[in-house]
Amino acid sequence: MKFTKSIREEDVKRDWILIDAKDKVFGRIITEIATILRGKHKPYYTPHVDCGDYVVVINADKVKFSTSKKLEDKYYKHTGYFGNLKEETVEKLLNNNPEKLFKLATRGMLPKTKLGRKMLKKLKVYAGENHPHTAQVKGN
């Protein structure tokens, strides 16, 4: 009888992957990022182990949206006080803080546990071309 062997946290080899978001569709990039952060692209994927890679996204402010989602989609937060439900449109987030927009969208595709929060810490988003991770990213 054969058994499937689960990988341990110590045995995971992590890479740094650079994604250029310029003129790419937002939802498709987020899906790709979430897959890489979870480690589902690796042959030894194990759901209860963080086996994903680091992701560096550049040109986050130059991403494209299909249809009119830029104006229609909203992100909500609540301050804790009565009647203080705050909403921000995607367009406003993209103009003011594209890093936050990418983190919020990716967080929605990751597990809502300690493991998901740990995975999200491996996402690095930058609005421009420059980033401080040139030493880690292969091919740069």
Curated annotation (Swiss-Prot):
An example Gene Ontology CC term for this record: cytosolic large ribosomal subunit
GO MF entries:
mRNA binding; structural constituent of ribosome
Give the organism the record lists. Answer: Nautilia profundicola (strain ATCC BAA-1463 / DSM 18972 / AmH)
Q: What does this protein do?
A: This protein is one of the early assembly proteins of the 50S ribosomal subunit, although it is not seen to bind rRNA by itself. It is important during the early stages of 50S assembly.
Starting at the broadest rank, the lineage of the source organism is:
Bacteria, Pseudomonadati, Campylobacterota, Epsilonproteobacteria, Nautiliales
Its domain of life reads: Bacteria
Q: Which Pfam families match?
A: Ribosomal_L13 (PF00572)
Coiled-coil intervals: none
Gene designation per UniProt: rplM
Q: Which UniProt keywords apply?
A: Ribonucleoprotein, Ribosomal protein
**Example GO biological process:** translation
Report if keyword Transcription is assigned: no
Spans traversing the lipid bilayer:
none
* Ribosomal protein in keyword set: yes
- Name under which the protein is recorded: Large ribosomal subunit protein uL13
Kindly state the subunit structure of this protein.
Part of the 50S ribosomal subunit.
Which family does the entry's similarity section mention? Belongs to the universal ribosomal protein uL13 family.
Q: InterPro entries given for it?
A: Ribosomal_uL13, Ribosomal_uL13_bac-type, Ribosomal_uL13_sf
